[in-house]
Amino acid sequence: MTRLTHLGSLPLAQDYPPCFDCVVEFADHLGGISLATERVDRRLAAVLAADVAGYSRLMGANEEDTLARLKAVRKILVDPAITSHRGRIVKTTGDGMLVEFASAVDAVRSAIEVQRSMAEQNAAVPQDQRIEFRIGIHVGDVIFDDNDIFGDGVNIAARLEGI
C-alpha cells in the first residue's frame, strides 16, 4: 500500500506529528488561520440550565398533550419569568433550556418565580401528569460564540440541574 504524503503543494495532516504547534502550522498552510492568536469572547455570567423531570415518561404516556402543555407553560409562565429578570434564552432542547443572566440574583429570582408558578399550576394536576422543572444555576466564566455559550460555567449548571 502506498502512502500519499502530498497532493501537489498541499500538505496532508499525516505530514505533521500530533502536537498543538504542528496543528497551528498545518492550519496556517491550509488558509492562513492562526489558531494560536484567535481570540474568544469570555465573560462572567450566571447560567441557568433547566429541563422537565420525567419528560420521557410524560411523552410516552401522551406525546401531543405533553408537548402542548409544555409549550403553554413556557409561553405563559417560564419565558416571561426569564424576560422579566433580564435573562436571555440561549437555546432550547426539547424539554430543556439554557439561559444566560448578567446577574446571579436575577437568575435565582427567575428560577424561584418559575418554580412557584409551576407549583400553583400543578396543584390541580395529577402527580403523574405534572410538568416539573429541574433547575441548576452556576456563575462562571463562559465562552460566547455565535449566540451560544460554552465552557465549565455551562457544564456545571447542567450538572447541578440533574441533581
Predicted stretch roles:
Residues 19-22:
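Cysteine-centered motifs
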Residues 4-12, 30, 35:
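Leucine-biased recognition of intrinsically disordered, low-complexity hydrophobic segments
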Residues 15:
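Acidic, metal-dependent phosphodiester-chemistry machinery of nucleic-acid enzymes
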Residues 37-38, 79, 98-163:
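Catalytic beta-strand-to-alpha-helix segment of the class III nucleotidyl cyclase homology domain
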Residues 31-117:
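Catalytic NTP-binding/metal-coordinating core of nucleotidyl cyclase/transferase enzymes
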